Each structure stands twice: as C-alpha cells, then as structure tokens.
C-alpha cells in the first residue's frame, strides 16, 4: 500500500539556534545569597521562621520529657511530624527565594504552607493549655511560626502585580533586576517572539514589533502522491487574478500608529531598558508614571510625561 506521508519541508525556525540559546537562558539558576540579604522581607521572614523552629525544637525535646500520663499530660505524637515538615518547608522556601524561582514554584509553596499551618495550629491547641512551661514554650514557637506562614501564604499566593506584593518587592535591592530578572534573557528571546514569563511560569508569544521582524510566512509543502484535486483549477473563472483584488492602503511596515487617548495611568515598579533592536519599545525608570491607552495583553501602549510613546511590558507596571 502506497504511503501518503511525503517528505515535508519544515520552517527553519524549528531548528533556530537562537531558540536553543533562549531555552538555555531559562534553565535553573544557582543559589545567590544576595536574593536573601538584599530583600528585607525575605531576610526577616526566614530569620523569624528559623528562630521559631529552634524554639519548637528545644521545647519539644523538653516537653516530651516533662509529659506525665498520670496527669493527662501526653505529648502529641503528630507534633514531631509537624516539626520535621516545617524544617524542610523553611529550607525549601529559603532555596526558592535564593534561586529567584518563586514564580516557578509558588503554587506548590502555597499548598505546602497550608499543610504546615494546619499542623502548627493543631499543635498549638494541644500544648498551650497544658500548664507545663516547656509545652507552652513549644506552643509559643508554633504561634510565631504560624504568623510567618500566614504572611508567606499571602505573599506567594499573590500575583507580582498585586499592590501589597509590589510594595514589598520595591524594598528589595535585587528584585529590580530579578523579578523579571529574566530581563536580559527576555531581550535575547525578543527576536524569537517570546515575552517575559507570566505569573504561572509560562511564556507568551508576542508579535515582532520591529520592521526587521516582518518576514513572509513559511510555506509547508509536501508530496500529495496523487491526492491533489486538479478540478479546482478549472473552477477559477478566466480572467480572474490577484490583480483584481483590491489592495489595502500601503503603509510603513512595522510602524505602530500611537493612539490618541490614554485613559489609564500606571506606575513603574521596576526599571526597564528598551530593546535597542525594537524601535517601538520605550525605557522607563522605577516609580515613573506612564499613561496607558489599553491594558489588555502582555504589552501596553504607553506614553511618558515627555511625550515619548511606545510599548511597555505589563509586568513592570501597576495601574494607579
């Protein structure tokens, strides 16, 4: 039986070396202590959580020793699991923040934090009314850890563009180049039509905005091996050609006509340097206020106070 699968000529973009370079740019990054030390929120919360865990550890050791079954003072065995679970939870959050991969694992982090919060609150309920100093100290450690856990759930469960999280991140020294610390990699991938990662760690396709990025569509051809239908050629009226089709008015390729209205205002939460290969992008500094014409999509048409117009990445801006 004759095969109908002829040889196909695929677009060269499938084997584009620039795409391979872009993929390598987004591989797992190493640990950078500057992400912890330079971020007051991360430094404070991880330090308090570690201190609370140490209190829980020593309180559990002495509390287990001081239990008295005759007085109905029994140490809850599940508290040991909660102790170990929170140890790995704090350690995991430390590495996630240090490697600047919170946007990749934020969903898993929130789930694990919820489990840890349930264990901590259950331990508090069983230890705080015991009347034994060591058990009450353990309960105090769990209370402190639960407070940090609730703050973490709110932080990691919020989008980077949320007002409270953007305000917290504005104090970080490294977040300006790190939130989208993929800024340098994003510029590399701009040539391939890939935008910055969104809040869920995925990448969105965006059209090329520069004239150099306008290329004719790739044609995918194949051998039909007798399946073609030549009758369709005879159905085309004689004298009909593409010249009879009205053509749209010619314009400058790659040129974006700026809108006349800018009803929105947005504040830059991070500085952004425009791609020098894309004339439609604009640069702006941190805390600069821009006028926005449309808030749909990943790239917004913006106008600066100087009158300069262009497109700006939405994850660097927050609406006012």
Swiss-Prot record:
Provenance organism: Sordaria macrospora (strain ATCC MYA-333 / DSM 997 / K(L3346) / K-hell)
UniProt membrane topology term: Multi-pass membrane protein
SMART domains: SH3
Key words, A-Z: Cell membrane, Membrane, SH3 domain, Stress response, Transmembrane, Transmembrane helix
InterPro entries: SH3-like_dom_sf, SH3_domain, Sho1_SH3
One annotated Gene Ontology cellular component of this protein: plasma membrane
Side of membrane Extracellular, spans: 62-77, 125-136
Assembly notes: Forms homooligomers.
Protein family (similarity comment): Belongs to the SHO1 family.
CDD domains (UniProt xref): SH3_Sho1p
Residues spanning the membrane: 41-61, 78-98, 104-124, 137-157
Compartments it resides in: Cell membrane
Parts of the chain on the Cytoplasmic side: 1-40, 99-103, 158-320
Compositionally skewed regions (Polar residues) per UniProt: 187-245
Annotated function: Plasma membrane osmosensor that activates the high osmolarity glycerol (HOG) MAPK signaling pathway in response to high osmolarity.
PROSITE patterns, sorted: SH3
Protein name per UniProt: High osmolarity signaling protein SHO1
Region of interest (Disordered), residue spans: 187-258
Domain SH3: start-end pairs: 261-320
tRNA-binding keyword on record: no
């Amino acid at each position: 039986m004759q095969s109908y699968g002829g040889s196909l000529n695929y677009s060269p973009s499938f084997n584009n070396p620039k795409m391979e370079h872009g993929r390598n740019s987004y591989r797992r990054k190493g640990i950078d202590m500057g992400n912890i030390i330079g971020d007051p929120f991360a430094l404070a919360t991880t330090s308090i959580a570690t201190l609370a865990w140490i209190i829980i550890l020593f309180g559990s050791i002495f509390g287990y020793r001081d239990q008295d079954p005759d007085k109905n003072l029994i140490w809850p065995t599940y508290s040991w699991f909660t102790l170990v679970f929170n140890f790995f939870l704090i350690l995991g959050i430390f590495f996630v923040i240090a490697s600047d991969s919170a946007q990749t694992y934020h969903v898993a982090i929130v789930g694990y934090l919820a489990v840890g919060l349930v264990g901590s609150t259950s331990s508090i309920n069983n230890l705080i009314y015991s009347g034994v100093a060591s058990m009450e100290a353990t309960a105090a450690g769990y209370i402190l850890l639960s407070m940090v856990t609730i703050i973490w759930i709110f932080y990691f469960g919020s989008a980077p563009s949320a007002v409270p999280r953007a305000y917290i991140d504005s104090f970080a020294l490294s977040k300006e180049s790190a939130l989208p610390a993929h800024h340098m990699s994003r510029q590399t991938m701009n040539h391939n039509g890939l935008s910055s990662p969104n809040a869920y760690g995925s990448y969105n396709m965006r059209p090329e905005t520069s004239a150099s990025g306008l290329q004719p569509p790739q044609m995918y051809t194949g051998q039909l091996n007798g399946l073609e239908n030549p009758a369709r050629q005879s159905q085309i009226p004689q004298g009909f050609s593409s010249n009879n089709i009205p053509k749209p008015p010619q314009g400058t390729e790659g040129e974006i006509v700026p809108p006349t209205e800018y009803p929105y205002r947005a504040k830059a939460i991070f500085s952004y340097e425009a791609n020098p290969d894309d004339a439609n992008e604009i640069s702006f500094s941190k805390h600069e206020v821009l006028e926005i014409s449309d808030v749909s999509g990943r790239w917004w048409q913006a106008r600066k106070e100087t009158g300069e117009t262009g497109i700006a990445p939405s994850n660097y801006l927050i609406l006012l």
